[in-house]
Regions:
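Helix-biased detector of long, well-ordered alpha-helical tracts
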Residues: 1-330
Length: 330
């Protein structure tokens, strides 16, 4: 009888494990490197490489705009991109809980394969383990990319730089929370690979000083971290922050601040003021960048400070997210 759920036998390393790998993962991620089924993948490469890893525990596994599979590819690909690297290879490790439906696992693997194709990366190695549980799933992905010979990071930020946000705040956070609270809304996660957007910047004459994708803790937290690393002050204009009316209403209903709400397909970019118009044009012309906006600038004020000029003309200091926030958002 064909099995329909994950059992402990699928983690034994025996016939059930082989059937699981061959029936789902090898089929979904099929490529010549993975097909060798050796203990490690040997891939071509030259020069400096970028390496990152991330783990994904999002609850629920499927949500409006994505699923844990798409998220696991986007998150790791975007981390490579934020250093200006060209993403190339991924590995993936799956922790499967007993009771997980095979059909759900197939959907997730297919989603990962489709997202990897969109991002231009190849899944070259993987692993599965099974634990007792209630039908859950956790994924770890590691990514390798090729550096492009440009130093990009928070330490490169300069006074006078302009801060560009690639799109609307808070959509992933709102999508996950609305699912958990059974709130009827059509807000969709912004989960997306930012390959086209970053490639457009990296192949242009724009000088990119820093990029950071906006995930847990939201824009406020990542800007605070970058301000502290750079030793500079970041000034934002609240009126310039892009937030959709639906997300703004959702925040008002639950008392949330869009600045602290996570995304999974947005980034903040710091460029010299002389390059801001061209950078903004390139981002808006790329996939997932239509709502990009200049939201602030960098100055040589108090080191590590992030200040928001409110809509009524006041000023408030921003700190990193304190406390739990929304657990298992990614």
């Amino acid at each position: 009888m064909e099995q329909t759920v994950i059992t402990t036998a699928h983690g034994s390393g025996g016939a059930a494990t082989a059937a699981l790998i061959d029936g789902i993962f090898a089929k979904a991620f099929d490529n010549p490197v993975l097909a060798q089924m050796e203990d490690s993948a040997v891939v071509p490469g030259a020069g400096e490489i970028a390496v990152t890893t991330d783990s994904f525990v999002v609850d629920p596994l499927f949500f409006n705009g994505g699923d844990i599979g798409r998220l696991s590819v986007c998150g790791t690909v975007n981390d490579l991109l934020m250093r200006g690297a060209e993403p190339k290879y991924l590995t993936c490790g799956f922790i499967l809980e007993t009771g997980l439906l095979f059909e759900e696992l197939k959907r997730i693997a297919a989603s990962m394969a489709a997202t990897a194709k969109e991002a231009g990366v190849t899944i070259v190695a993987g692993d599965t383990k099974v634990v007792e549980g209630g039908g859950g799933l956790y994924i770890n992905t590691a990514g390798v990319g090729f550096a492009q010979g440009r130093e990009i990071g928070a330490r490169q930020i300069q006074p006078g730089d302009v801060i560009i946000l690639s799109g609307n705040l808070g959509e992933h956070h709102a999508a996950i929370l609305s699912e958990r609270l059974s709130i009827d809304t059509d807000i969709a996660s912004d989960c997306a690979p930012l390959v086209e957007m970053v490639r457009a910047l990296m192949t242009s004459d724009v000088t990119v000083h820093a990029m950071r994708d906006i995930t847990r803790g939201g824009l406020a937290t990542i800007l605070k971290e970058m301000a502290e690393t750079s030793g500079l002050t970041f000034e934002l204009k609240e009126s310039c922050l892009p937030v959709t009316p639906k997300v703004r209403d959702f925040c008002g209903l639950l008392g949330l601040d869009p600045l602290y709400m996570g995304n999974e397909g947005k980034m903040a970019v710091m460029v010299p003021e002389s390059d801001a118009d061209e950078a903004l044009r390139l981002i808006r012309a790329s996939a997932y960048g239509a709502h990009a906006a200049v939201v602030g600038r960098v100055c040589a004020g108090e080191p590590g400070q992030v200040v928001v000029e409110t809509a009524v003309g006041g000023r408030r200091n921003i700190d990193v997210l304190r406390g739990e926030g929304l657990p298992r958002i990614c």
